[in-house]
């Protein structure tokens, strides 16, 4: 399962004048796009753009892999792109716009005790939804209405026609994992303050932060560590000038050689 989303990087004030030309009401700066693998708990693709670059346009630039389930929000609403996902034997789960023109083909029974309010198959009834642009998605799709506390029902759309509706709702709920990732890197890797103010300087610092995350993540997984990623990051920051101390993470699992023991005793 892969989750697609973006997060704004606000850049305002003296030195960031270059960011004003492509600003939106929501953001003046850059936008960080990420494809996040829920199984690996790690990003698989990362890109930067200006805020006025649509999320769906970035999604179109990334390759679609067979048998992968892609989860994304309404920012990626593009019927033709959804069709390309379907054609490549991949799957998607997203939100359906309230004003989407559809015709219901079949309704499924729902359990009274389930949060699933409605479940059924439909077709898009508008052949040209965007000012004359032909809608390529002509196959059946699935519409699921999910109850939410103190909010309007969540309307989901997917090409997973046979899976339980509850599972599909849970897949969309798991999209928040990528929000936690964005929050983690912004807080832990200090990408709210930048060393330089030029466009290249900001982009380099952002990409460097992602690389740092991936390196620590790979180190943690390759050594079967249970230490939280943040604690490992702090430990590494405090010992950048003592590379031999990286062995401290797994010295208890291997016999300590006399050379390593000597270095640890003399360099710490």
Q: What residues fall within each predicted segment?
A:
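Single, function-defining residue in the core of a domain
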Residues: 1-268
């Amino acid at each position: 399962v892969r989750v697609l989303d973006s997060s704004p990087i606000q850049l305002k004030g003296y030195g960031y004048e270059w960011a004003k030309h492509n600003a939106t009401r929501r953001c003046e700066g850059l936008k960080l796009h990420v494809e996040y693998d829920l199984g690996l708990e790690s990003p698989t693709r990362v890109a930067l753009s200006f805020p006025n670059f649509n999320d769906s346009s970035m999604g179109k630039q990334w390759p679609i892999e067979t048998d992968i389930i892609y989860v994304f929000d309404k920012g990626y609403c593009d019927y033709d792109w959804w069709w390309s996902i379907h054609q490549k034997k991949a799957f998607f789960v997203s939100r359906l716009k309230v004003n989407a023109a559809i015709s219901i083909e079949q309704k499924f029974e729902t359990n009274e005790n389930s949060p699933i309010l409605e479940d059924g198959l439909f077709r898009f009834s508008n052949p040209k939804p965007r000012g004359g642009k032909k809608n390529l998605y002509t196959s059946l799709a699935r519409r699921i209405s999910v109850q939410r506390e103190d909010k309007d029902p969540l309307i989901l759309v997917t090409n997973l026609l046979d899976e339980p509706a509850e599972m599909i709702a849970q897949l969309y709920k798991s999209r928040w994992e990528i929000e936690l990732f964005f929050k983690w890197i912004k807080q832990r890797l200090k990408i709210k303050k930048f060393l330089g103010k030029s466009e290249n300087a900001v982009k380099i610092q952002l990409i460097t932060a992602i690389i740092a995350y991936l390196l620590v993540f790979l180190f943690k997984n390759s050594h079967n560590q249970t230490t939280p990623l943040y604690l490992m990051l702090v430990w590494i920051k405090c010992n950048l000038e003592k590379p031999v101390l990286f062995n401290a993470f797994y010295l208890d699992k291997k016999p300590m050689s006399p050379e390593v023991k000597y270095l640890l005793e003399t360099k710490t």
